[in-house]
Amino acid sequence: PKKDTSGTITYTTGRLAKPLDFFAYFLADRPNAYTETLLPVEVGGRTLDIALRSWPDDPAWAKQVGGVLAKGLPVLSDSIGLPWLDPGQLVVAEAISRSTGGYSGRYDPEVGRIEVAYYASPRVVLHEAAHAWFDGRLLAERWANEGFASFYGDQAAAALKFKVARPSLTSKQAANRVPLNGWGPAPGTDVAVDEYGYVASAEVARAIAERAGPAGLASVWQAARNGVAAYQPPGLGESNGAVGSGSDVGAVESGAAPPDWRGLLDLLEDRTGRTYGDIWRTWVIRPEEASLLDERLAARRLYDDVVRRAGEWQLPPVIRQAMRAWQFEQATALLTAADHLLDDRAAVEAAAETAQLELPRAMRAAFEGQASFAAAAAEADAELQTIAAYRAAAALQPAAPDIVLEVGLWGATPDADLAQAAAAFSSGDLRASVEASARAQVAWAGAAELGRNRLMTILGATIASLIAVGFIVGRFRSMRRRLARRAEARAYARSVRTLATREAVRSRAMAHPIDQDPRPRGRR
């Protein structure tokens, strides 16, 4: 370029070998020369004041673009299923196209500004307006944002009866095919690749939308907006509209970054219950990434099987993290270990059911926690041993104890010990359960022998007591006989003395008859 004294700039070329192939164009504008008009638009229950900035000599542009936005933004919000996300003011400015093949519009999410060419069609306006949602903060990659901005823009245009021509992929554009996950950021340096990328990404978005359905896509966007990745723990169910791998599963794990091509595939399949691997293989991935999709498919099948088998139990977070990061070798190893632990759980459940014991929560807590599976395996072994101790004690419990067992159990409370063992097991105090079971087992196991010993002791004591009583009674009776004989002897002696006295008196009487009484008669 050459500039003369008047300020005129002249561009010249040298001799052209192929002058018919030569093409040049010039762009110029005055970015600060705008007339601003505020346009209030109701979007998702919120009133937006859109700043329309048109060139002073082109009021028709503001009228046309403002009319499209006033009608289109509410339709876009309803179709996408999200409210207006940008807290700031939306600025829509008239501009010129700065490329020969790119779109005649551009959206800058950093400042909330849309530039729309002075000649742009309603389709372009709606496409750029859709970028207010698909601006890199909802989805991470260019192809996804461009594709769904085109899809929803075209959908809104059709709903509003705008006549728009939807471009289809030409063979010339297809010749510049690149994997969409390798399509670089805008603005691209290769115009032909960009042309392919815009059209191909729109084709992919339409294919995805046809398979997912409006409600399925809305669920994906809601999850992406809230930072909710795929592979959520069980228990969320209908509240998140989730189906598929791990989605009928406690607390939402949020904080995920906007999904890239991998996270988007996971979210789509998780939220819609459909598969999209064929679309990804055809349009999105590099050839060397095809094996990664195969690994993913096998890992997801195993994941679904283990989640289904786990039931109400949640898989530990480390498994879900490995699946989200596409670390499928690590995820497969962890899932296999989890499956083995579920075998242990089944063994513990069967043993507890047989023993009529309520399972503690310790194994589940260890399984679902951040620790390694070794803690859960150790807990399973400990619970099995505790149940075995309980069953060993319960097996000795007599249905109807006889007198020998009853005597042997004097002072022992094995029934209470067994009940204590069951309660301690259910509360997770395995040591106390084993100790209580041991007390019950020892009491019942030794009751018969102890009862016999006690009865023999009682019998011996009884016999000794009877002998002592017999001896005492014999002695008493012997003493009574001796006393009786003595009393009889004394009575006999008294009788003899009495008889002797009587005989003596009689003898004296006979020796002195009354007629021979020497005393004078008058003194009688």
Feature-to-residue mapping (PLM):
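Beta/coil-rich, acidic/histidine-enriched accessory regions frequently appended to metallopeptidases
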Residues: P1, A192, A230-A438, L459-I463, ...
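Extended, low-hydrophobicity, Ser/Thr/Pro/Gly-biased non-transmembrane segments
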Residues: P1-N32
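Juxtacatalytic substrate-recognition/specificity segment
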Residues: T35-R137, E141
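Soluble non-cytosolic domains of exported or imported proteins
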Residues: P59-K71, Y119-A120, V124, L139, ...
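Acidic/His/Gly-enriched intrinsically disordered linker/tail segments
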Residues: Y119, R142-P214, A218-A257, D304
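Short, aromatic-rich amphipathic segments at membrane interfaces
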Residues: E435-T457
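Selective detector of the "anchor" transmembrane alpha-helix that sits immediately C-terminal
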Residues: R454-R477
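Cytoplasmic C-terminal tails of single-pass
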Residues: R480-R524
